[in-house]
From Swiss-Prot:
Role: Confers resistance to phages by a mechanism of abortive infection. Seems to act by interfering with phage RNA synthesis. Does not act at the level of phage DNA synthesis.
NCBIfam families from the UniProt entry: phage_res_AbiGI
Gene of this entry: abiGI
Protein name (Swiss-Prot/TrEMBL): Abortive phage resistance protein AbiGi
Record keywords: Plasmid
Amino acid sequence: MAFLPRYYPENIEYLKISKENTPLKEWYIPMTCFCDIPLHQMSYHAEGKAQTGYGKFSIALHKKFGINNGIQPVQYLNSNSIPTEELRNAISILLSDNGQIYSDEALISLSNHLFEYMRRIKPLDGSMKKWDKEGKKYVEIKKNFHDEHEWRYIPDFESDELPFLLYRQDDIIAESSSQFYTKSITETKNGLLNFSVSDIRYIFVDSILSREKLISFIKRKQKGKRIPRAEKDILISKILVYDEIKEDW
């Protein structure tokens, strides 16, 4: 079993950066995101207000799974702070570089560090794109990101495989219209985030009917990597109905 990362749009207007005199409003990062939240706060994130909730289906994993796989908490930024201003200046230098940075080994190391940091930042609050209820298009919603305690898995692509980040308009159009880059992640060497039954703590579903359907699916599963019957039983024992247990929180 594995999580498949996808190129996800991040609103970066708060950084106020430009490329070739054109303001950058968003970039796409290949990632799988997790929230490090206590169970008693889960209803706020699952249901939220209007379209801000993420839904009642989720998988809870042991934290050691994330730590062992190099999953990193994001850094939340106050857009008015001095560190954010200095970061803005550094990113502008990196984006406007004409090749000089990559002629010096020390500067290469510094630029690589900055680049990885760029992929793991988020404002304290702001807007984000989220699939609508029908799963047909993105809608933009307002969120307090700091409440999510987000951790990110970002695949370690080889330099000749896929882009580490999309910011050019033609690349963004290709991804947003057809998931051009996301569909290629399965072909990369280290793109998938593998996990096992033992890594799972709970599986939440919205209703008893959904639990019955999921149990039936697990029992019938034949395609792909086979799961031994004993592990199927363990997996089934981890399934919880959200609406049944939320009152206990």
